[in-house]
Amino acid sequence: MKKFLLCLFWVTFLLSPCLLQAQEDAARSLDALQKKYSGLKDYTVDVNVHFDVEGFKAPDMQAKLYCKPPDRMKIESKRIFFLPKEGGTFNPFMFNKEDFEVRFLERLTYDGRNAVKLKLTPKKRKLNAQDFILTVDTDRHLIREMNTSSFDGREVKASIEYGHFGDFDLPTRIELHLDVQFSESMEIRDFGPSAQPPKGVTGRVDITYSNYSVNSGLSDQIFNKTDSSNLRGGS
C-alpha cells in the first residue's frame, strides 16, 4: 500500500507541471485570438443560409449582417430570416478568458496544422448559460470548430472555413449541426408574411458569407432598432 501511495505521489508530482503548462497554453490561445482581431472595428457581409433540417422546408435565405465588436449586431432582410444564434455569427470577442473557466483537453492536428481543444465553462451560471468546446488552430489563431451545449440538452456543432479580407481572416462558410429548440435558438427577422418556425429541429445548416466590407466606419445608429436609415458613418 505504501508503495502504491508513493507511486501515486510521484505520478501526481511529475504530471502537475505538465498540467499547469497546458492550462497556461489554453489561456494564451484565447489571448492570441483576442489580439488577432483587436483591430477589427466593424464589418458588413452578405449572408446566405441553406437549411437541411428535419421537418423544416424553406428556400435559401439571404440577408445583410452588420457587426460592430464586441457585441453589436444587426440583420437586414427583405423576407423572413432565421439565423442560429449558436454558431451562426462570428464573434471572436465572446471568449474572454476572464469570463470562463478554461480547461485544456488535448493537442491535435487540424487540416495539417497544430491545434488545441479547449473547454470553456462560464464563471457566472445563468439560465441560458452554455459550455463551449473550441478547436483552435494555434498556427493561425483561428477557431475551426465550436461545440456548444446548454443545461437543457441543446447542442450545436459549428465547423468554420475562412478567407482573408482586409487584414483579417473572416468566415466564408459555417456548417452547423443542430439538435436544438428552433424558436429559442434563432434570430428571427420578419419582413414579409408572418410565419412560425418549428419548435425543435435536428439537422444541418450551411451559412455562407460574401462581399465583406471591413472597418468601413459603421455608425452606431444602424444598431438602433427605431432608426436604420443611416447605414454608415465616418469615412
Sequence positions of predicted segments:
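An acidic-aromatic
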Residues: 52-111
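Bacterial N-terminal signal peptides
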Residues: 7-17
